[in-house]
């Protein structure tokens, strides 16, 4: 297993998963800077390819997904591995629970069955060609997608290391060459220096745009619909986090009066819960406290928190990011 994360999260990852500090079977890869998902996934995939060969199957999964029934995800991944061994880039599609505008969508095409035995086997297990990836839609378009049995794109990809490298060599040859250069010195004293030299030159692009969309246009991407009972939650915003916290209790000391659906998140860096937060007449809000900042937002505005992050970046407040 490999984890790719930024320098700021290194100590936190090792505190939760100390076995990654020194293990032949577990690898912690630290990005010098954020270069979007293609660079992060590519780094891990090319190191796996260097260590285990072209046929090694790699899967990429975000760390901020909550899965209520992981056994159903395992079933989908097993199906995806079969299609990946047949040369497809495979993604896991999720059955929408609402007409959300927060996620991209996948238009599933026909079942994988090119007249060969492998294609028929993949089709029997539920794998389908991807007809199209579509960006986050407006509300009306999202409703049409759900009615047409589109799937949510959760950004989970399974592919052989060699197939990924061949697509990247064709579509982004400079990135391919630099990732090969980095992976070639994995496990040697030259790795950190080689990573630092090449990393800033990698194209900053999501894997969806770099590989998934163009390869899907050529018929090379498959989707495996996960079971509708999977119980998937994207914990990428306070709307989702608040939904979890209000069921499990606040992550901080809070007193709520006429404030149903509100939640408090406290992280003061010293294992303390921080001050008592009293919420009166403010339902469905999220309050986050850190040692140097406080955020208050309505749950239905959770997606807009990115605007605060952008403003802080423009002001050079890297200490708060």
Indicate residue ranges for each PLM-predicted region.
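A short acidic, often aromatic-flanked loop/helix-cap motif at beta-alpha or helix-coil junctions
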Residues: 34-39, 98-100, 139-140, 231-232
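Conserved beta-strand segments of alpha/beta enzyme cores
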Residues: 27, 129, 222-224
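A conserved hydrophobic position in a structured secondary element of the catalytic/binding core
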Residues: 5, 61, 137, 159, ...
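Left-handed beta-helix
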Residues: 162-321
